[in-house]
Amino acid sequence: ERLLRLTLSCMASNPLVSRISVHNECPEVRVYVNSIRMARALVNLLENACKAIDPEKGEIQLIVSCCSGTTHWEVVDNGIGINPEILQRMWTHGYSESGSTGLGLSFVQQVVDLHHGTIEVKSSPGEYTRITIILPQNKGEHNGKEHFIN
């Protein structure tokens, strides 16, 4: 819950924040993460989703779920989708299709790697994109900057 609140507070100035619905399917699970970095990673994904949707009728979901000792954070949008040839390159530092710096998704990948997690992407051009961050529960680097988020 705290990580979700932090993430949404960072999105408060985005005019499309009202298009984001949150579904927390495992509020009692505790995951050891760097909350600032993880919130920034989720914000990067949500901001990309905001760019991909139709501002009038687009929808974005932020879904938290648990499965077999892992916690999943999913950002799902009904936007323009991602072409298959871009899927492999989009995590590369500096890669951008939109003219941005290309640092956002590489940062997401670094944060997920730091937390010993993985990222899955499913997308259909013109229909949707689903990006899932999968992290082990109660794992992470214990460097004094991280704490449990539930």
Regions found by a protein language model. Give the residues of each.
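A residue-level detector for a conserved hydrophobic packing site
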Residues: 38-39
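Short conserved segment of the HATPase_c
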Residues: 82-94, 148-149
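Detector for a conserved hydrophobic position within an alpha-helical segment of the HATPase_c
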Residues: 112-113
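Short alpha-helical Gxxx[C/S/T] motif in the catalytic ATP-binding
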Residues: 104, 108
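Conserved micro-motifs of the catalytic ATP-binding
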Residues: 30-33
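Acidic ATP/Mg2+-coordinating residue in the GHKL
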Residues: 77
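Short beta-strand/loop element within the Bergerat-fold HATPase_c
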Residues: 59-69
